[in-house]
Amino acid sequence: PVLDSTFNQIKVGNVCDIGCGNGVFTGDIKRRVDCNLIGVDSNKYALEQADKLDFDELIHVDDFTKDRLPIEDSSVDLVICKDVLEHLIDPLFLTNEISRILKPGGHFLVHVPNHFPIIGRLKFLIRNDIDTFSYFSGADRYDFPHIRFFTLHSMEKMLDLSGFSVIDNMSYFFFNFSIFHRFVPTKIKKLLTIMSTDNFSEGITLLAKKL
């Protein structure tokens, strides 16, 4: 639904998935839209799996917090970055790189988890565990893969520093309010999430435009 909503709003030619992994999220994107699809990841094995899908080009980058993306300036129409920034020591470095490779007026679709909506805070209070939605059930605090915990405001601030303006908040796709979320109409989910993303969404999903 997130990709469909994005493509309903913008036109794309070159699409780049930063942190594409095995391609599970964007590997079939060319069935939805006519584009040139680039995948970038730090895991060589994952890239081997992604190579079985519809990517036109796959690129290996060792470290997203210090390595320049081997992509030309102002050459990409849309960058997708899902579940990556929360793993990085310096996520601003990557968002700056994404801004560099995007064309003027290009778009950035980004998603990060929100560990602490209302339900997450209650779980933390009861269990004293930062993994509020069991993303990594085998991890402990000393090796927990998520090292950055974002709010809507902190995401907007970081995007602003990288030269972006948020044009759509699609976090309502990740509305979470215990068992009741199944019975809440989409319009109400959207309203609650826009009013208070941090309280009602399990993930922060934003579409931003390069200024």
Locate each region found by the language model.
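Class I SAM-dependent methyltransferase SAM/SAH-binding core
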Residues: 24, 28-67
